[in-house]
Amino acid sequence: MTRQYAFYFDSSACSGCKACQAACKDKHSLPVGLLWRRVYEVAGGAWTRRGAAWVSTVFAYNVSLACNHCERPICVEVCPARAYTKRADGIVALDEEKCIGCRYCSWACPYGAPQYDEQAGHMTKCDLCADNLDAGLPPACVAACPLRALDFGERAELEARYGTVHVVYPLPDAELTQPALVMTPHQDAARAAHEPAWIGNREEVNAE
């Protein structure tokens, strides 16, 4: 592998408009039920009564997530059809013609990135808009974000520019697959580690 492309996401800038999600769906003509990029609406805190007053400790932030093109992609390891490959540029590619639709990759991926297309009978996933990259263009989701909360590039360059945070709630431990994802956390993300927090749109993003 000569490089590792990665996504960058700035949770502190994201408004939750889901333009990235819509742009991805439009570019790849995804059917109903498939979302290669999903925006998780995280909420937490509570209202507590203090005497005659009610005090709010409520917080909320968004996490936009697609395939993280992990450095240790578990989908590549578990696929019995060898339909997945890790390209020299770090992109985890899926050969849909080889895929037998067993869904092992979907069950194994801690991010739920591979998604089953009921009509086609095989798995599908984000390819980092490889055709756009070949044409010198950014991924559709990155180009669509009105607040520039998304970026992409080589992982080392993104880390040098934005820092080395790779996980916030509700994402799993980065050590599992070493995701090629760099993040700027929302100011309230640290609270989700020690206060009650939940995904507010769990059904929409198909979160387990």
Q: Which role fits each region the language model picked out?
A:
Residues M1-E208:
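Non-ligating segments of multi-cofactor redox enzymes
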